[in-house]
Structure formats: C-alpha cells, structure tokens
C-alpha cells in the first residue's frame, strides 16, 4: 500500500472532563501503535476549555513524566474546528470559521476521550452530524455506558447479575434510612458519570457518607452509591469485527489488596496511573469454566447496551459467580491498560487491534444503523 492509499485517521484526545490527562496518555500509546504503512494520522487535542487544536502528534508529549500529567493547551498547535456539515465530511478547518482554510481532511475519527464531553455521546453526536465515521460506540451506547445508573438498568433488564445500588440526584443530599439498611456497609460513593476512579470514596461508617457525597459532587451532581461486593476484580475486552461478529478476550485480573499499606485500598486513580502498585494478571488465574462465563457475560453486556466497536467489561468474581460492575465504551489505552493487554494475550497485537477498530468503523459508516 502506498502513501496515497493510507486511511487518514484523526486521533482526538484530551477534552473537558477530569480524565483529560488519561485521555492524552491513551492517545500517546495509540499514536505509537497505529501502523504508519496503513494509516496517515492527524492528532487533534481538545483543551480543558474545549478548544480543538491540531498538534504535531508527538507521543512523548502525551506521557506521564515524574508524576506530572500531560495537558493540551492552546499553545499545543493550531486551533481548528469540525464543521457539522455532511457536505464537508472529514474536513477540519481553521479558526475563525469565516476563514475556512482546510487544515486537514480525514476518513475516520478515533475519539480517544474518557469521561463526560467525549465518551458520553457528545462527540459521537457531533461526528454523526458532520457525517464522519468514528471508532467505538454510537450516541446511545456511549451515553448509557457513561451513566452508571442506566448501565445497571440495562443490565438488569437483560437479566444480567449486578450489585445493589442507590442514586442520589442533585436535589437529594443523602441516603434514606431504608437505602442505608438495604445497602449495608461498606459502600462505594461515585460520580454517576465518570471514570478512572476520580471522585470515588469507600465509606465504612455512615458518618463518612456526607464527605464522600461532597467529593463525588465535585465531579458530577448525580451520585451513585454501590454496596461493596466481596470478590476478585476481573476484566474482559470485547471487540466487534468488521463483519459485525463480536469476540471476547482473555480474562484479566486486578489485585489491589493492601496497596499503600491499607487493607481497605481499592483501584483508585493513584494506584492506576501514578503509584504502579496494583498487580495485573493476564490471563487471570481462574478456572476455564469461570473464564468462559465471564466472556459470555461480557458479550451479553456489550449487546445489552447496544455497544459497537469495542468495550471493556468489569466484574467482581464472588462465591456465587461473576457479578457485573460496569462497561467502558472507550477503555484506557495507556501502556498499563488492561484492554490492549488482554487482547495481546488473546493473540491480537496492539497494531492489529487498532487496525480492526478502524476497519470496523469504516465498514459501519455513518447514519442510522
């Protein structure tokens, strides 16, 4: 394949959410692994304020260095915009919009955005309006997968095993006595629409609840309170192929007991991205019967949310079997992320994994489907 036949891929990263830095790190890893013989890459960063910037795509600028998190700024490149006009499909133009100089033209977008204003259906809606194919879930699945309440409702509607939970809407300050009795202790308090364990607290006494709710509301006015589930933390990757078939990866396990000297530790932001203290087992040391059950549930969860492209599904393995925790419609792609690791253990290397996602997006196209 010569250069003129390469697929032009816009890797979009950063964004307005509190997962901005992790999106940058994921994008750096993807930029390193997209096969240059097959793909011509355009790297587009979104600042925390929402400006789109055409960058040079240097992966080194998107890495965590000395515990310093990367960030897209207006100085990272040239500001641009994506017109919501299908007639200009894939054209990225300069600002101000009146100038309309075409800075780049792309065939497909890889939105490596984590959290609200990116992974939640917002950029997917923009790309649908603009008539540009994109990697990953559509508007509905992205929105439902981002909101933990509606993810659980969709899982439950399909008869999938989930844990107990309660939702605190903006008008509700705390849990009712009935909810406290039903959930028991400990509980985990989380922003309903967030990821990377940002704003998550483990509550062992009801005296700690108000502070935990306040911490979650620093990131989302809607809060979910989940009953703690005793069990091992398992994960499974799901990948849609260009022909529409869906496959599940080797199962992985995250072991976090006692990190940083605490028996009540969990897989929080620092453990995931800064401290390098969690232990990741790929494949997980579980019986084949359990692994098969997890893979089957992962595919059922993927279909329950009407996902497309890819997802990572997280579980707790309890004494009575696997319980679904959540689905990530755009999982992390950092060097320590489980999704590419699990597929590598399944015989799909990183460049091939990315190529499959892009090919699936192009095959799917745009519009209702």
UniProtKB/Swiss-Prot annotation:
Binding site for ATP: 180-235
Chemical reaction(s) catalysed: 2 D-alanine + ATP = D-alanyl-D-alanine + ADP + phosphate + H(+)
Cofactor mode of binding and number, as noted: Binds 2 magnesium or manganese ions per subunit.
Pathway annotation from the record: Cell wall biogenesis; peptidoglycan biosynthesis
Domain of life of the native organism: Bacteria
One GO term (biological process): peptidoglycan biosynthetic process
Keyword Chloroplast tagged: no
Keyword Ligase among record annotations: yes
EC annotation from Swiss-Prot or TrEMBL: 6.3.2.4
Binding, Mg(2+) 2: 326, 328
Cofactor(s) the protein requires to work: Mg(2+); Mn(2+)
Listed Gene3D superfamilies: 3.40.50.20, ATP-grasp fold, A domain, ATP-grasp fold, B domain
Alphabetical UniProt keywords: ATP-binding, Cell shape, Cell wall biogenesis/degradation, Cytoplasm, Ligase, Magnesium, Manganese, Metal-binding, Nucleotide-binding, Peptidoglycan synthesis
Top EC class, one word: ligase
Domain ATP-grasp: 152-359
One function term, GO molecular function aspect: D-alanine-D-alanine ligase activity
Function of the molecule: Cell wall formation.
HAMAP family: Dala_Dala_lig
Stated family: Belongs to the D-alanine--D-alanine ligase family.
Name of this protein: D-alanine--D-alanine ligase
Organism taxonomic ancestry: Bacteria, Bacillati, Actinomycetota, Actinomycetes, Mycobacteriales
Gene (UniProt): ddl
């Amino acid at each position: 394949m010569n250069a003129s036949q390469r697929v032009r891929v816009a890797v979009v990263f950063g964004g307005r959410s509190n997962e901005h830095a992790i999106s940058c790190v994921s994008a750096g890893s993807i930029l390193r692994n997209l096969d240059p013989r097959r793909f011509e890459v355009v790297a587009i960063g979104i600042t925390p304020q929402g400006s789109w910037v055409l960058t040079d795509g240097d992966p080194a600028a998107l890495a965590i260095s000395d515990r310093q998190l990367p960030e897209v700024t207006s100085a990272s490149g040239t500001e641009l915009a994506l017109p919501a006009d299908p007639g200009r499909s894939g054209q990225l133009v300069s600002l101000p919009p009146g100038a309309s100089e075409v800075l780049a033209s792309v065939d497909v977008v890889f939105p490596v955005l984590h959290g609200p204003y990116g992974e939640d259906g917002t950029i997917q809606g923009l790309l649908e309006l603009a008539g540009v194919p994109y990697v990953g879930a559509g508007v509905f699945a992205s929105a439902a997968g981002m909101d933990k309440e509606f993810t659980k409702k969709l899982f439950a509607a399909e008869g999938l095993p989930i844990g107990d939970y309660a939702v605190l809407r903006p008008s509700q300050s705390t849990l009712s006595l009935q909810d406290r009795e039903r959930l028991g202790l400990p509980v985990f308090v989380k922003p309903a629409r967030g990821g990377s364990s940002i704003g998550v607290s483990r509550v062992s006494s009801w005296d700690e609840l108000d502070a935990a709710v306040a911490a979650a509301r620093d990131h989302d006015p809607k809060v979910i309170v989940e009953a703690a589930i005793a069990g091992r933390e398992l994960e499974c990757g799901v990948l849609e192929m260009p022909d529409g078939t869906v496959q599940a990866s080797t199962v992985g396990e995250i072991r976090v007991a006692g990190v940083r000297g605490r028996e009540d530790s969990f897989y929080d932001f620092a453990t995931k991205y800064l401290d390098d203290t969690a232990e990741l087992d790929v494949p997980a040391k579980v019986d084949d019967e359990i692994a098969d059950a997890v893979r089957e549930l992962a595919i059922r969860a993927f279909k329950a949310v009407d996902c497309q492209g890819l997802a990572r599904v997280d579980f707790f393995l309890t004494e009575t079997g696997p319980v679904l925790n959540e689905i990530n419609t755009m999982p992390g792609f950092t060097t320590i992320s489980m999704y590419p690791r699990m597929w590598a253990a399944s015989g799909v290397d990183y460049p091939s994994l990315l190529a499959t996602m892009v090919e699936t997006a192009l095959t799917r196209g745009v519009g209702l489907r």
